[in-house]
């Protein structure tokens, strides 16, 4: 089905942006105003297939590449927010294997072991999972108690969410939002007033102008990825639910602050 309004900014200037391949035509739509891209609702995978795909994700802390990816997200987010020290942290959309929570718990334990870790400020020198933990243990001046670092996922941990946290981490989740406004509303409801939301997702590169450009972009090939953002689309989604855009912590990390009266 065609969208009468953009799912991201609400503008009426939405046009077909199909991807044509040997397998056929996959329907996407793009907004002329915010330039975000949505997969047509009729192309969304059934829930059972989405769950099967999520279970295939290799989100394992023993994988150095993935551990380094998580470390980068934490490092850039906390660097941007400094000197803010969260009193609670929620991993929103933590999946079947809450690796980000596990990493922060390991960092907290390392800190509690009376500083028995290698003290390094060289992010580029990290070359092992242990060094990921050591680096964050030294870099993060404060973490809340373990029970105040928790996760929630609509499929795998629907009862995990406790009280709203004052730091909500949302890594590789926003691209799965079938309805971005609803997704952002969930993030806002999970955050305390004056708290922060950090969203990690790969934005649409400036080089993607035509649907032929988009066809070659690898990030769309995961069929559970249905929403693709520009920075402007991020800003507009935040406006719908009282999340004020603060800027980018890195090219793929977007920081918001929950307004006190939202």
Predicted stretch roles:
Residues 227:
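Post-transcriptional modification and biogenesis factors for structured RNAs
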Residues 177-178, 191-193:
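Helix-to-beta-strand junctions that scaffold the AdoMet/dcAdoMet cofactor pocket
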Residues 194-202:
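Conserved beta-strand signature within the Rossmann-like core of class I S-adenosyl-L-methionine
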């Amino acid at each position: 089905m065609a969208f009468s309004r953009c799912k991201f900014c609400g503008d009426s200037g939405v046009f077909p942006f199909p991807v044509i391949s040997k397998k056929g035509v996959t329907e996407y739509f793009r907004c002329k105003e915010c330039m975000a891209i949505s997969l047509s609702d009729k192309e969304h995978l059934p829930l059972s297939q989405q769950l099967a795909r999520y279970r295939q994700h290799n989100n394992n802390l023993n994988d150095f590449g993935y551990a380094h990816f998580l470390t980068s997200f934490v490092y850039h987010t906390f660097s941007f927010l400094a000197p803010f020290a969260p009193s609670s942290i929620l991993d929103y959309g933590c999946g079947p294997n809450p690796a980000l929570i596990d990493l922060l718990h390991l960092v907290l334990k390392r800190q509690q072991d009376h500083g028995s870790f290698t003290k390094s400020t060289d992010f580029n020198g990290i070359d092992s999972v242990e060094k990921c933990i050591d680096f964050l243990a030294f870099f993060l001046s404060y973490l809340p108690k373990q029970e105040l670092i928790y996760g929630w996922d609509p499929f795998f941990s629907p009862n995990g969410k406790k009280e709203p946290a004052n730091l909500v981490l949302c890594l590789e989740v926003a691209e799965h939002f079938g309805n971005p406004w609803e997704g952002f509303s969930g993030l806002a409801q999970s955050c305390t007033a004056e708290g922060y939301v950090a969203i990690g997702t790969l934005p649409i590169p400036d080089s993607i102008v035509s649907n032929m450009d988009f066809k070659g972009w690898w990030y769309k090939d995961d069929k559970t990825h249905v929403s693709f953002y520009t920075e402007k689309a991020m800003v507009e989604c935040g406006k719908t639910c009282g999340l004020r855009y603060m800027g980018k912590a890195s090219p793929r990390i977007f920081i918001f602050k929950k307004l006190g009266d939202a």
